């Protein structure tokens, strides 16, 4: 006689074992119809699963995040159902969920075309609209293997042989004649899987191992209703328009080429944005009492062995040799900062020491993972390391948190997600050290009133970390900032200070980055602003243009006044119609167009319009110089008149 406790604390008693769906039916027909699955004592279970003992139960519907994830997983099975009907000889591999959707890896004897994808999507919809029930059956390991052997599914057999114990009872999900194997849970009926779209096909190695066969990976997205799907597809369209690679080319910001994969060639305008970001961060370094340093580009392998990087990070490090010595090009700045700390005796009175660097780092990322500015091999980190005592940890982490939010708000990012990443399987240091480090970061977050999500096993090999993810205008998350606590590296590199009792102690090291990779951050803000950079970041802040040749000298005089005020302004005195010039510079996203005609010369003024087409009227040159200077000084996000 199980007693089921619901989230509101109410209880229901049943005479016999009861399924999740039956509990929902006892509450109401509306809830039963909406039931996708349940959470029994915190564990996700299928709607058909029986509950035989007292338990806490939450009903999962399409309104829940878990419900949407289950819909996506079941839509992957729907894809399997459809493709098996269209291509009976296809071999099915794996079909997990991913952010906003799912994929299925398949082994087919020919490449899928866009026409195939369209046909496949149509068949999926036809099947889903029959609203068939999904039947779950627990079977023995051998029965599952026999099932997939009879269906000639070698990848499913491999999963059973390599990943599932022989005394286990795998779950087989029956989608009419199609059978798939999965942990589940899945939707009880395909009426939940009507809103999806297949997105693309890519190559993927079985098990992610390049020694294995290349499979075809079909990506799709699935949502709970028609509006969610339409909104998502609209966001994708908008993201395509905002693609930093397209905008970077259109605005002549940078380029990349095959001879230097993952390395950026910054053009003048892109480098202007880069330097403005550095200048801004430097003002904050001064405000938060950091010293700026510069470490060497590469160091001897021996040092990287002492730090643990060689044992834990070698695959991502570029190396070179000279005079029978092996060097590694630095993938991060921390070992160099410890070397600077070690020069000269340090006292507890000197701590904390906050050491910052715009460090040029290189990581040998797989070529297939490179993506514009978002994933590169050569990048610049706005990196800092704080050497402090254990008693100073919380106050220093709190200061870092304040600095993170201070900087992000300047760019208009206020929706920030905080995650605490804990010890990974591959790590250095004792568990007691990790306990202290993880607790120290958790305490700082709690004392600052920040909600956070724990990411088990996602920390760096030398310490746990706080991650800050920005949510942009398209509802995407970008992980940028990190604060990492490190009790190990200073000791490995013999960093010490003289404590109050005259004993030599090892300092705690806090790693922190806010923008992260400056290259990547430029990619993020390029897409956030769609290339319409605020005045302080815009490579060209205003263009002064004439109407006829008679105003050319006046234009040059005006440009000189703006330039002398430290503003980035250029002249356009080409023999072109003023409307043509305005259109051209509008496409270049220049914030302000300053037009000079005969009337403006007489009045010693300029006519001002914005890149959005707003006519701001006329201003004296001195007046508008001050307006632009103020916009730059305050780092305002909007233009005048917006």
Swiss-Prot record:
Catalysed reactions listed for this entry: tRNA(Thr) + L-threonine + ATP = L-threonyl-tRNA(Thr) + AMP + diphosphate + H(+)
Region (Catalytic): 243-534
Any single GO CC term annotated in Swiss-Prot or TrEMBL for this entry: cytosol
Top enzyme class: ligase
Keyword vocabulary terms for this entry: Aminoacyl-tRNA synthetase, ATP-binding, Cytoplasm, Ligase, Metal-binding, Nucleotide-binding, Protein biosynthesis, RNA-binding, tRNA-binding, Zinc
Gene Ontology molecular function: ATP binding; metal ion binding; threonine-tRNA ligase activity; tRNA binding
SUPFAM superfamilies noted in UniProt: Class II aaRS ABD-related, Class II aaRS and biotin synthetases, TGS-like, ThrRS/AlaRS common domain
Binding residues annotated for Zn(2+), in chain numbering: 334, 385, 511
Superkingdom of origin organism: Bacteria
Cofactor note: Binds 1 zinc ion per subunit.
EC number: 6.1.1.3
Pfam families found in the cross-reference section: HGTP_anticodon, TGS, tRNA-synt_2b, tRNA_SAD
Subcellular location as annotated: Cytoplasm
Role according to the record: Catalyzes the attachment of threonine to tRNA(Thr) in a two-step reaction: L-threonine is first activated by ATP to form Thr-AMP and then transferred to the acceptor end of tRNA(Thr). Also edits incorrectly charged L-seryl-tRNA(Thr).
Similarity comment: Belongs to the class-II aminoacyl-tRNA synthetase family.
Name of the protein in its database record: Threonine--tRNA ligase
